[in-house]
Amino acid sequence: MILSSYSSFQSVLCCCCCRCSVQKRQVRTQISLSREEELSEKHSQRQRPWFAKLMGKTQSNRGGVQPSKRKPLPPLPQEPPDERIQVKALYDFLPREPGNLALKRAEEYLILERCDPHWWKARDRFGNEGLIPSNYVTENRLANLEIYEWYHKNITRNQTERLLRQEAKEGAFIVRDSRHLGSYTISVFTRARRHTQSSIKHYQIKKNDSGQWYITERHLFPSVPELIQYHQYNAAGLISRLRYPIGLLGSCLPATSGFSYEKWEIDPSELAFVKEIGSGQFGVVHLGEWRAHIPVAIKAINEGSMSEEDFIEEAKVMMKLSHSRLVQLYGVCIQQKPLYIVTEFMENGCLLDYLRERKGQLQKALLLSMCQDICEGMAYLERSCYIHRDLAARNCLVSSACVVKISDFGMARYVLDDEYISSSGAKFPVKWCPPEVFHFNKYSSKSDVWSFGVLMWEVFTEGKMPFENKSNLQVVEAISQGFRLYRPHLAPMTIYRVMYSCWHESPKGRPTFAELLQVLTEIAETW
């Protein structure tokens, strides 16, 4: 091996012109190494990567022009991506604060800045600018199905059929996401010729290898909207042509993440109490109105029932959790005692009461749809790394459209009642807890999965108390010995298997909420 060195210099006389000068000429010195020395040198270079790098540069310049000593200019900074996208309003929105911008359904707007995931700065066609809720708009592209009235992103098969039967129009249709990822389903309502019976047919919209969409392979289309447009004029294999699109668009305003951007504290003078609608772990709950036009639920927190300072900080985090299957927290009132928690109002109240009051009237498909709603909300909390800690039918609420939403997520941590956090107390939700919680007080998303299995049992028993003839201590002993809840008579074996999978003794043996949602969706499509 030969090493080249440029560290030695010689002085030479320059005679090329009348003004002589002394220059330093770099002289390469070659050193021959033995085999042992060569191996030692390679080992040293591996131990000193900076040296090996230097040697590599020296070798590459051998016999060439000496590289410039000037450092290259740093690369120009990348321009931030342009956030200015065109959107279309899905709902009307009235400004709530001076910095808000009004939205009119179906109008186009330009997004100037995404302040956070839930509030964006926008400009209308008149040049007015302000903040808007991001869940009230969608990107205005032809390929974006959300701009079409007939498309429903978050809807179950049962909810679809209920909407179509309410309209009861020949050819009424809805397009929704299929249980098969990347495909869609058209649901069509039709009446029999004698007008005594009606039926709903479901057709899957598939995509072939060349990227074309179809229901039957005889009719291929480059996009889903073009497929829908064709079948609005031609049945072409469907039970009826697509006559009337059925949409939720604009009919039911979704809750916003807070009343405005970074507004978590609510002035109590802006609240009007209408009537008492119930009581919970923390105090009385009232139906109220915010600024006389937005219905809200107002929870008055009894003094001493909650660690208030800790909860106020947590409330700021909880407000950023926003999903169509979560009861939205709007803010808190802290200027007086008792403290008020202001949330989205749900017309049909507590799920547990809803089930008990309608016992014998609810179809199995609706019960499954309720479980899907809850599982969808819990899958969102799972993705957000947020633990509920007290998932049960009593902590879920039902909307006027029979959509079930999860309430009181995370609040169990701030209860100061010793009975609530003691496995021997009546208020502790032992009957919904897995072994690792009542033995070691260890919560995780998988402990929520156990509770979800018990909640499914509540739903399919139409509101029965789990382990109704056992005390909390007996429940702890029974669960520890491997005892599990029996199969409700309304639950087919496929449903009971899902429940039972949630009650694995080891958290690692339980499915995730994402996996549960996929299984429940597949079951719903076969009913």
UniProtKB/Swiss-Prot annotation:
SUPFAM superfamilies: Protein kinase-like (PK-like), SH2 domain, SH3-domain. It is found in: Cytoplasm; Nucleus; Cell membrane. The modification Phosphotyrosine is found at Y91, Y420. Residues 58-81 are annotated as: Disordered. PROSITE patterns: PROTEIN_KINASE_ATP, PROTEIN_KINASE_DOM, PROTEIN_KINASE_TYR, SH2, SH3. Coiled coil: none annotated. Keywords: Adaptive immunity, ATP-binding, Cell membrane, Cytoplasm, Immunity, Kinase, Lipoprotein, Membrane, Nucleotide-binding, Nucleus, Palmitate, Phosphoprotein, SH2 domain, SH3 domain, Transcription, Transcription regulation, Transferase, Tyrosine-protein kinase. One of its GO terms (molecular function) is non-membrane spanning protein tyrosine kinase activity. Residues 82-142 form the SH3 domain. One of its GO terms (biological process) is positive regulation of cytokine production. GO terms for cellular component: cytoplasm; nucleus; plasma membrane. Its EC number is 2.7.10.2. InterPro entries: Kinase-like_dom_sf, Non-receptor_tyrosine_kinases, Prot_kinase_dom, Protein_kinase_ATP_BS, Ser-Thr/Tyr_kinase_cat_dom, SH2, SH2_dom_sf, SH3-like_dom_sf. Expressed in early thymocytes, T-cells and mast cells. Residues 271-527 form the Protein kinase domain. It is a peripheral membrane protein. The active site is at D390. Phosphorylated at Tyr-420 by FYN. Autophosphorylation at Tyr-91 is critical for the activation of TXK, leading to the up-regulation of IFN-gamma gene transcription. CDD domains: SH2_Tec_Txk, SH3_TXK. ATP binds at I277, G278, S279, G280, Q281, F282, G283, V284, V285, K299. It catalyses: L-tyrosyl-[protein] + ATP = O-phospho-L-tyrosyl-[protein] + ADP + H(+). Belongs to the protein kinase superfamily. Tyr protein kinase family. TEC subfamily. Non-receptor tyrosine kinase that plays a redundant role with ITK in regulation of the adaptive immune response. Regulates the development, function and differentiation of conventional T-cells and nonconventional NKT-cells. When antigen presenting cells (APC) activate T-cell receptor (TCR), a series of phosphorylation leads to the recruitment of TXK to the cell membrane, where it is phosphorylated at Tyr-420. Phosphorylation leads to TXK full activation. Interacts with PARP1 and EEF1A1. Interacts with SH2D2A. Interacts with FYN. This is Tyrosine-protein kinase TXK. It comes from Mus musculus (Mouse). The gene is Txk.
